Amino acid sequence: MSKIIGIDLGTSNSAAAVVISGKPTVIPSSEGVSIGGKAFPSYVAFTKDGQMLVGEPARRQALLNPEGTIFAAKRKMGTDYKFKVFDKEFTPQQISAFILQKIKKDAEAFLGEPVNEAVITVPAYFNDNQRQATKDAGTIAGFDVKRIINEPTAAALAYGVDKSGKSEKILVFDLGGGTLDVTIIEISKRPNVQVLSTSGDTQLGGTDMDEAIVNYIADDFQKKEGIDLRKDRGAYIRLRDAAEKAKIELSTTLSSDIDLPYITVTSSGPKHIKMTLTRAKLEELISPIVERVKAPIDKALEGAKLKKTDITKLLFVGGPTRIPYVRKYVEDYLGIKAEGGVDPMEAVAIGAAIQGAVLKGEIKDIVLLDVTPLTLSVETLGGIATPIIPANTTIPVRKSQVFTTAEDMQTTVTIHVVQGERPLAKDNVSLGMFNLTGIAPAPRGIPQIEVTFDIDSNGILNVTAVDKATGKKQGITITASTKLSKDEIERMKKEAEQYAEQDRKMKEQIETLNNAESLAYSVEKTLNEAGDKVDKETKDRILSEVKDLRKAIEEKNMDNVKTLMEKISKDIQEVGTKMYQSASSTTQTGSGNQNSSKQENDKTVDAEYKEKS
């Protein structure tokens, strides 16, 4: 039975895991572990010759190819933003799909079997558009996405499996590269894992800290040299990499050296950056960012109807929670020390893998009850957002409410679905709109229109409206600008497959060029060693062909390479045959003389010779 893998599709780094023989195991990346601590950085790059790179190779070449490199695409999920790379445009779903495609390939290499099913995590505070975009990305990558689950819930699954026992109320503080989620979860003795509330900020994370460090370095340089390095994309990428490395180092050391030679060139010559960033300075820079975590913590406690003192465990998830200042700030605010035993960088992927094993029936003692993070409403008269499903409602869920018309003889109503906590529809996120037509004409207030919201286990919403008098029914598959149609998904799947085919062809090309180089070398060696056993005309002709082959290799002219390889192989084979026949003829002549000698000497004995060991 094939496995369902768990995927942590992160802003800065991504990881995957799988349950093998009941034990969650992180799937290694083909390039090894990145500095971020997860399997690989969430980078995608396109070279000028059309090659696509994902992960560490994409990150390594970012400085030389800033225009072709994309990172932090997750922050654009659920928007209509397009990444422009040279003469092409890509949606956030496509970029995420390329990352997921790499994970699929790594998982198949690790498990030695096809991997087609996945559980993918999202920040708990992702709205419906963002969740649907994530699911679309998985489909484009070739996955059957069995479940979309919240990252803190996944982390709690990892925790719950390891620490089943007495009932606990756990606050999961998940601070990743681009998002913050604060989730309060109750784990009972079974263990049941029930989400009580969730809150967060989809625009708060480690990348904001990196940006604060970048601004500090850039401002200092601008003050000294009068140049804003942030306007130079190549210099900016170097600054960003240096900032991230310093941030990571300062989790375990008190100072970090930043050394960026030749960061730019002016009329007076090359300019360099050489400075030391202390942990104290880092804490000063990130303090305004860290202070923003209080509001989501308070909101999560309010949603769960709990006080700080009700929390029995604090669980940290995400790379930035390794920063001592972040840990101390949250621990001091809640008045509780964080639990150990869960790797902040692996917990989400492991939890997703556990959920996959639950869906497969491999793990049977976990019941997961998640919640919808934001209130789902319809727009009613005056632009009011009328709630249908409140925030922190356990999912899956189906709820209905009856509405009526606002005007006499109204035969059409517009159902506008929004998500958020603001009282006016215009201030919330619009998820979609549709019309219910054919309503029986009647005075206003008489028709009864039943609107039903249905959220599945992935947290994805479907809405229907029914006129109770006529039975007329209309449904919606969310038509926000970021939702992809089936045709668009299929087109993007084909594009993703084309890149996979491109990778295969690139590998094939490299292997052919390597074989051609080996052939050129071995032929030259053979002809040189043959000496006068090969006539000069033949030798010169073949060496000329080898010269042409080397030129074709250099130019990567694959048609010429293949043609010349075939010709040279045939020619050298003929040379070899002639040399063998010549040697054989000489041997036979020698053998004839030996036979004559044998006939003359009756004492000669035929024997088999064994080589001395």
Swiss-Prot record:
The keyword Chaperone applies. Residues 579-613 are annotated as: Disordered. The keyword Nucleotide-binding applies. Residues 581-597 have a biased composition (Low complexity). It comes from the Archaea. Residues 599-613 have a biased composition (Basic and acidic residues). Keywords: ATP-binding, Chaperone, Nucleotide-binding, Stress response. SUPFAM superfamilies: Actin-like ATPase domain, Heat shock protein 70kD (HSP70), C-terminal subdomain, Heat shock protein 70kD (HSP70), peptide-binding domain. Signal peptide: none annotated. Belongs to the heat shock protein 70 family. Acts as a chaperone. This is Chaperone protein DnaK. It comes from Thermoplasma volcanium (strain ATCC 51530 / DSM 4299 / JCM 9571 / NBRC 15438 / GSS1). The lineage of its organism: Archaea, Methanobacteriati, Thermoplasmatota, Thermoplasmata, Thermoplasmatales.
